[in-house]
């Protein structure tokens, strides 16, 4: 979630070598020639892959049969605050037990999830003896703690998700710097070095390396970057020139070790991507990780979410589609998209970061219009961004009654809508594609309409 939301919602190994003058080394005695003993071949890497292998092909995520795959999931993070205070005091076994129990409950409740966005929560990797600088900042990162809990907590949780049929998208600890003492990120800054270190460690882990069940989202919500012109921003060509350099170096670091699918973030809290169409991230198995909240992209919102990139106004479907086409469309035309944060619910519930309604596709509201845009794009995976696994586990597929709705059963809130939409996706009911024909009965004059990014 955005750094503005962080108060409420979730928001380097070195090998040493010594050198000396060879002339100072003692002369070794000659050894009579003997047949060389064949060297043992290195043991092949164990294959931890369990789910159908996915890869990026053009603008699509595909399986080995060449079929397009769009994933639908949810999120988990691992700190007492976001785990309903069900455990405390770095009790790792209780953390594992609680979160596995939540996964079991979510599956039993009938949710049709096939991926999870897993936060490698800084609760575990922070060195709390260091001074606090910012919420979920990288400044207190301990490589020793990170390696320990990657082994003992995060990888075991990833394996558990995979055993339940879910791919895992790992997100690095914390959020990108933006507020004081920072203005944003900058090529060569300490945050880039932090990300390089994190992904160097993760991409070499024996149970993660080349395990295509596990993917990587490179960073959470970059806001502004220092451009080649020296100015901080999120939309200019100069900013995207440096965004390409910034994230390409991390992609290259990962590719030194493995081929796992990578999801690259944009700028502007992961809402701005157009510049990547010119300054392309190079390599295979690369898509883009997008965030989408009510009020962003010109969409409808009951209340502005406060990042400064949206509003509480909106005109229903058409402005939303135009905003999506402008800000995300240029990369959706060349690579798959994964929306790794999205939610909505009426303001009265105060239960989600985004305040809006499901509404109707083509009309007012946020949720149904987003689904329509994603379905017509044909290459958008997305999820329910939640820090409340216990609510998903408690979900009952029993309709509420008007006047007595709750957050979980109100059709205008995202849980009810997503629960049923994701079941439809899993059953193959929803067909992605553009409309084939549109008739306006009784119309003689020419009309210009926009649907799914296409003008008619």
Over which residues does each language-model region extend?
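N-terminal structural segment of carbohydrate-active enzymes
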Residues: 43-136
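Bacterial Sec-dependent N-terminal signal peptides
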Residues: 13-44
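Extracellular glycoside hydrolase catalytic/binding regions
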Residues: 51-54, 78, 82-95, 183-215, ...
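A mature extracytoplasmic/lumenal domain signature
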Residues: 75, 120-122, 172-174, 220, ...
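Single conserved hydrophobic/aromatic residue that forms the stacking wall/gate
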Residues: 1-12
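Short aromatic/hydrophobic helix-turn
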Residues: 176-177, 223
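Aromatic-lined substrate-binding rim segments of carbohydrate-active enzymes
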Residues: 95-176, 194-195, 251-258, 354, ...
């Amino acid at each position: 979630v955005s750094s503005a939301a962080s108060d409420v919602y979730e928001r380097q190994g070195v090998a040493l070598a010594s050198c000396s003058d060879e002339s100072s080394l003692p002369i070794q005695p000659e050894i009579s020639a003997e047949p060389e003993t064949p060297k043992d071949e290195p043991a092949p890497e164990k294959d931890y892959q369990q789910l159908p292998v996915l890869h990026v092909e053009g603008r699509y995520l595909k399986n080995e049969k060449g079929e397009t795959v769009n994933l639908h999931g949810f999120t988990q993070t691992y700190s007492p605050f976001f785990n309903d205070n069900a455990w405390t005091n770095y009790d790792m076994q209780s953390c594992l037990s609680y979160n596995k129990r939540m996964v079991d409950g979510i599956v039993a409740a009938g949710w049709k999830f096939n991926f999870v966005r897993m936060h490698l929560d800084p609760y575990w990797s922070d060195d709390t003896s260091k001074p606090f600088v910012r919420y979920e900042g990288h400044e207190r990162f301990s490589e020793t703690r990170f390696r320990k809990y990657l082994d003992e907590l995060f990888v075991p949780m990833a394996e558990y998700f995979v055993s339940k049929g879910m791919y895992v998208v790992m997100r690095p600890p914390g959020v990108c710097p933006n507020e004081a003492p920072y203005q944003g990120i900058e090529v060569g800054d300490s945050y880039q070095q932090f990300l390089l270190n994190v992904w160097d460690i993760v991409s070499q882990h024996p149970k993660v390396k080349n395990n295509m069940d596990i993917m990587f989202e490179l960073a959470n919500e970059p806001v502004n970057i220092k451009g080649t012109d020296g100015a901080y921003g999120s939309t200019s060509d100069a900013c995207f020139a440096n965004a390409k350099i910034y994230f390409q170096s991390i992609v290259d670091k990962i590719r030194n070790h493995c081929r796992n699918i990578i999801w690259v973030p944009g700028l502007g809290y992961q809402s701005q991507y157009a510049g990547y169409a010119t300054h392309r991230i190079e390599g295979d198995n690369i898509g883009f990780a997008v965030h989408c909240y009510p009020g962003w992209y010109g969409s409808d919102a009951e209340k502005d979410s406060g990042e400064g990139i949206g509003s509480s106004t909106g005109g229903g479907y058409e402005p939303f589609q135009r905003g999506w086409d402008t800000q995300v469309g240029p990369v959706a035309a060349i690579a798959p998209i994964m929306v790794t944060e999205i939610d909505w619910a009426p303001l009265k519930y105060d239960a989600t970061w985004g305040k809006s309604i499901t509404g109707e596709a083509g009309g007012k509201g946020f949720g149904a219009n987003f689904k329509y845009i994603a379905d017509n794009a044909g290459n958008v995976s997305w999820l329910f961004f939640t820090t409340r696994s216990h609510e998903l586990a408690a979900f009952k597929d029993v309709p509420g009654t008007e006047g007595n709705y709750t957050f979980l059963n109100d059709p205008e809130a995202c849980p009810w809508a997503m629960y049923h939409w994701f079941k439809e996706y899993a059953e193959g009911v929803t067909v992605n594609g553009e409309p084939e024909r549109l008739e306006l009965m009784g119309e003689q004059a020419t009309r210009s309409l926009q649907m799914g990014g296409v003008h008619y």
